[in-house]
Amino acid sequence: MRKQTIYNVILCSVLSLYTSFSAYAQSEIAFTNKVTYTKTGSISGVRLVSLMPAPITNEYQEISELASNCGEFISINKANKVLFYDGPFNNNSSDVTESFMYKSKPIRIDFSKTENKNEVTGIDPNGYLGSDGTFIDLSNTTIVNTGDQLWAESSNKLDYAKRCYEYVASHYRYINGSWRTLAQIISIGGGECGDFATLFVNLMRYKGIPARHNMGVWKDGGYHVWPDFYHEDYGWIPVDPTFKNSNPGADYFGRYDGNLIILSQGLTSFTSGDINIEEVPLQTFYYWYWYQSGNGGVDGVHKTSKDYLVNGINSVKTNIETVGTILNLNGMKLPHLKRGINIINGKKVFVK
């Protein structure tokens, strides 16, 4: 082969503004997750390698009827599975698709009770204590100083975790963008949902408390990442510092409302032949390609059911109401709305 090109793609984790915490709670839905690959130029003799996360049943969801149109599902550990395709790419456009049934498992941790732990048998929490030096760097000066300060103020591990959650939410700004390293997050003073999760996970692991990222897609479209941590009395405890940052008056500690399809937990390592990734967030997909002749490349686009299926449109009613603050269905304040008509929670909102 004349030329080798490698592409890694991780899409920005953006917070969906159209998701209801309660509309689909504990309901089962059919869902499709796919990547569309398209050739550009006139290349031929193409080998395509595609790697995308595949959901499994865990603390927050039940997955059944998992199927794909190509490739194979590979379990890389007890918490994560991937759909891996390695083969020819002969057409100008081709999809790698996985479909499944999804049922949410909303969680509210009752801290007055310890008899029902939120955990899945077989997943060792100690697997979420390590440091990769990029996303997780337990020697980072800011993490060390902040962690020591909050630990000194805390009465126990649970108190420390809540202080970390509140600290991240109140001391960092929400800044749009793609995944950042820990050093980049601290340097710019904030980040998006994945970055808020990274800060929390680092603070927890620094004190020997297992913690991880939960990465996925909203059932109604968009991406989100939030962390959880392990406590010996309660199991895995979900928190969302991003939501807390946007809505400081609400409480997202020990609460998961069941509206996210989790595609992977923690950072992912994967090796197959000449393909290797080490400790990376796998939320959407990675791909690589090689070609024998011609000029051009291969583009990849991630899509979910919401991106290309329309299940009908409800009739529209006009209802004019004057309000000072506009919230999404997650109870989060919506800043930076445009003057004119905005579509919020399926309604037209006019901003003067």
Where are the predicted features?
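Bacterial N-terminal signal peptides that target proteins for export
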Residues: M1-I10
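Intrinsically disordered, low-complexity N-terminal segments that are enriched in acidic
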Residues: A25-I107
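C-terminal tail/sorting-segment detector
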Residues: I341-K352
